[in-house]
Regions:
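ABC ATPase nucleotide-binding domains
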Residues: 10-34, 39-48, 285-298
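ABC ATP-binding cassette signature C-motif
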Residues: 1-14, 65-298
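Residue-level detector of short coil/turn "hinge" positions at structural boundaries
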Residues: 37, 57, 186-188
Length: 298
């Protein structure tokens, strides 16, 4: 079935591309001769033909079997992140204080808590983007890959979607660029040839996510990565992160995404950072909560 489906899709793609070429040639003809009296009938008949034309449809890419593989990355030291008494204040406002934690190589951890309690602020401290109190040490050979909603604004606006990914893809994943784009909802030829400058906010976010997944890093920090992803794409991303052999920090309110992915939870609240050595469901059980959104109400 999968072979037949693949063959049918390839056939459709060929027909689609031929039809698009024919449409473009017809439009060029109409444009060139629309004011020419001797060509009036030909122009009119081609306009009508375009109006009646049934467009070739291409089956959606079946991405269910797509496994994203991170590129091999250099091994980091045993303790990628060590914090001792780390805190952050803005004037009189204390965001959090005295955070002491150790993240080991290969750990997959979640930062959870209501908005404004310092999750993204601590990420910025790790990224060395802002000053802080206390000591924060990054381990030997740590190479950070960072995703936040604003990463999308750093993309080169003059490149197409395909070029953006083609520039960073190395090794065998190069043969899967089309599948990869399809998995993140850029499957059609038009979508992959769009310039970054015309993409919506959600599309830019998804593109920035693919780009990050292709870079060889050993500490991945994702700040609300699932905001613009559908269920299928979330699953593909989650599977890739499960296969990732580096260290992972995820800031998220998405219980289902974190379930089975993280084995340590850092809870931000009351100006403190508290460590829970468990998965997300066990954490919610201890809190007598159904979802992470309930933390907002506390």
């Amino acid at each position: 079935y999968l072979v037949l489906r693949k063959e049918r899709r390839e056939q459709q793609m060929k027909q689609y591309e031929e039809q698009q070429k024919m449409i473009q040639e017809t439009k060029d003809f109409i444009e060139r001769f629309k004011g020419t009296y001797s060509k009036t009938l030909q122009v009119q008949s081609r306009v009508k033909m375009l109006e009646k034309l049934e467009l070739v449809e291409v089956d959606e890419e079946d991405t269910s079997a797509l496994r994203l593989k991170f590129p091999p990355s250099p091994r980091s030291g045993n303790y990628p992140v060590i914090m001792d008494g780390v805190g952050k204040t803005y004037g009189d406002h204390v965001v959090f204080s005295n955070a002491s934690l150790t993240i080991e190589r290969g750990d997959k951890v979640a930062f959870v808590g209501k908005n404004g309690e310092g999750k993204s602020t601590l990420v910025k401290c790790i990224m060395k983007e802002i000053e802080h109190e206390g000591t924060l040490t990054l381990g030997h050979n740590v190479q950070i890959g960072y995703f936040a909603q604003n990463q999308a604004s750093l993309l080169d606006e003059n490149l197409t979607v395909f070029q953006t990914i083609d520039d960073v893809a190395k090794g065998e994943i190069r043969n899967k660029i089309r599948d990869l784009l399809g998995a993140f909802m850029f499957g059609s030829p038009e979508a992959s040839m769009k310039k970054v400058k015309v993409l919506s906010g959600g599309e830019r976010t998804r593109l920035a996510m693919i780009k990050l997944l292709l870079e060889p890093v050993n500490l991945l920090i994702l700040d609300e990565p699932t905001n613009h992803l559908d269920m299928k794409t979330k699953d593909i991303l989650k599977q890739a992160l499960l296969d990732f052999d580096g260290t992972l920090i995820v800031v998220s309110h998405d219980r289902d995404f974190l379930d089975g992915l993280v084995s340590k939870v850092y809870e931000f609240g009351n100006k403190k950072v508290k460590e829970h050595l468990c998965g997300i469901y066990e954490f919610l059980e201890t809190k007598k909560m159904e979802s992470l959104q309930e933390l907002e109400k506390k």
